[in-house]
Amino acid sequence: MIIIDEISLVSHSLFQKVNKRLNEIFEVSDKSGVYFGNIPVLLFGDLAQCEPVAAKQVFWRAPGETFSLWSDLFRPINFNINMRQGEDRHFFDILCRMRLGMSLLDFNND
């Protein structure tokens, strides 16, 4: 199994290259309908965090692209409970606003 953490930092082109290289290593034809060398791939990350530097995000779909490694092969599972800051609601709210790029200037400090 291949585990990729911080998937938000992986660009669309790098993701394509990982697939291609694994297919080469495990001698799988790109036309076989097998991806990532037929190795299970598990992705983790928060897509609202940092984007790849000077590149398209992993889920970007090129115009005319009929198949997407991201949307056609992977199914997202969303976690809705924050286990790290669950006790400190104020800190949790600040982190959520920062994650979404929202201003903290008008944040209620009560």
Can you say where each PLM-predicted feature lies in the sequence?
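Conserved ATP-binding/catalytic motifs of P-loop helicase motor domains
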Residues: M1-D110
